[in-house]
Each structure stands twice: as C-alpha cells, then as structure tokens.
Curated annotation (Swiss-Prot):
Stored InterPro entries: ABC_transptr_periplasmic_BD, Bact_iron-sidero_bind
Pfam families (UniProt xref): Peripla_BP_2 (PF01497)
Binding site for desferrioxamine B: W61, R77, Y118, R185, W213, F215, W269, F271
Assembly behavior: The complex is composed of two ATP-binding proteins (VatC), two transmembrane proteins (VatB) and a solute-binding protein (VatD).
Protein name: Ferric aerobactin-binding protein VatD
Subcellular location: Periplasm
Amino acid sequence: MLSAALAFNSYALDITHEMGTTSFETTPKKVVALDWVLTETVLSLGIELEGAANISGYQQWVAEPHLNADAIDVGSRREPNLELLSNIKPDVILISKHLAAAYEPLSKIAPVLVYSVYSEDKQPLESAKRITRSLGKLFDKEQQAEQVIAQTDQRLAANGAKITSAGKAEKPLLFARFINDKTLRIHSEGSLAQDTINAMGLKNDWQEPTNLWGFTTTGTEKLAEHQKANVMIFGPLSQEERQQLTQSPLWQAMEFSRTDSVYELPAIWTFGGLLAAQRLSDHITGRLTQPQ
C-alpha cells in the first residue's frame, strides 16, 4: 500500500503556463482544446482529443493533423459551451490568453492551462516549440515533442536548401490574404509565414509594422511598392475572387503579374503551430521549384 502511494505521489507534476502553475497527480486523459493551434499541437503528440472548438472550422482551415472523429464540438473558440464542457468532465482544458476572460468559469470545470503562440513577443515558431515541450511533459510525450520540433527544424532547413539550389532564394516574398478587392492582410514580423521563411533562409519584402498576429491590414494599391516580389496568396480563392483579382487593371499592370510571380497557396492555418509551419514551407517550396 505504501509503495503504491509513493508511486502515485511521485508522478505529481507542476506545469507552469501563462496564468500560473497547475499541479497534476496523473497524466490527463480527457483533453479539451479551445484554440486551433493548441488542438494542432496536442494532435501532433499523438493524443486524441475529448473535445475541440469549432470542429468544422478546424477541418476546413487547419486540416492537418486530422482530428479524431469522436471528438466533441464544444462550441465556438470565443464562446465555448460551458454546460457541455461540464458534462464532458475533462481532465484539462487548453486555451490561449485571447480567451483569458473565460479562465475563471472554465477553471470551475477542470484545470485550465493557458498557452499563446501569438503575442506581443512576435516569435510564434519559438513559442510553438516551447508549448510543444510543455505539453509533451504534461502528457508524458516528451520524446514525441522533441521529434516534432526536430522534424520541423529539419523540414524547413531542407526546403530552404531546395529553393536555394533551384536559384529561387534571392527574390523576396510577400504574403497576402485578400479580404475584398480593395483590402488585404500582409503577413510579416510576428507571423507564422515570417518565422517559417526565416528558418528557410528566405526574405520578406514587407517591413511595415504588424499587429500581434503578425499582419498589416492595408489597401491593394500598396502592392505597387512590391512589384519585384514573389507574391504568395493565402487561399483558397473562389473562382469569382480569382477572376475579380486577375481581371483588375491594377493587378494586370503589376510586374509580378506580368512575370508570373504570383502563387496561390491552399488552405493553411496562418495562425498555426509547428505542423502548420511544415505545411506552409512545403507549399512555398512546391510553388517556387515547380517547372514554369
């Protein structure tokens, strides 16, 4: 009996997160994630989720890693269903600081850990690595966590080398998501795109101030100042959006349009973690090294 008690107590684990330190006496099994980047990170460790926020949105925008089919949709990322969460009885709930207002009510349901990949630090890739290690410790998946981190570093470096050997590394990149025909978001400092291409040895042509998510909202006319860049458009664009864009006289006049230096990327969660960075890197590499 004594040896069993000692064994039980020896597992007690303190996890430090952005709103304190939480103790666990056993490895959490029923896990709920209310932020897509945390959903992605948990799944990357080979752990299935008991619940996740806005599952249809995750499947559309994040896509990989695939969410287990029996995961329960617990409501939106901004307003999770507290009653449903109470019924699930999770062992741990994972949120980002952007949901900090819900910390107290959620803490009445289960221990809550707060991790933010995107913040004023503007180092999402390093933050994602730190969080991956912390969750690896929590779920007794430390070896898997290190494998995910090493795989990310290796993939980004290898893709960068592939682009360099293809002679495509000198031309700077510009990452844009179109909001409408007059407005777009351009991703640079503090974005997943910026940290990913930094690790690949590539350059970003956009150097304007960004918000904590790593993008600048601006007018499409600003593209005229970046005509020598390879333009990466975050998709997917609808046929109507694509037609509206390509038929615009302004767009047609741009040097990057005339030199076929515009590339549409598939749905990639631009506010994701390490696996999202791998996917983004793969698609950038595929676009830049494909035969013209």
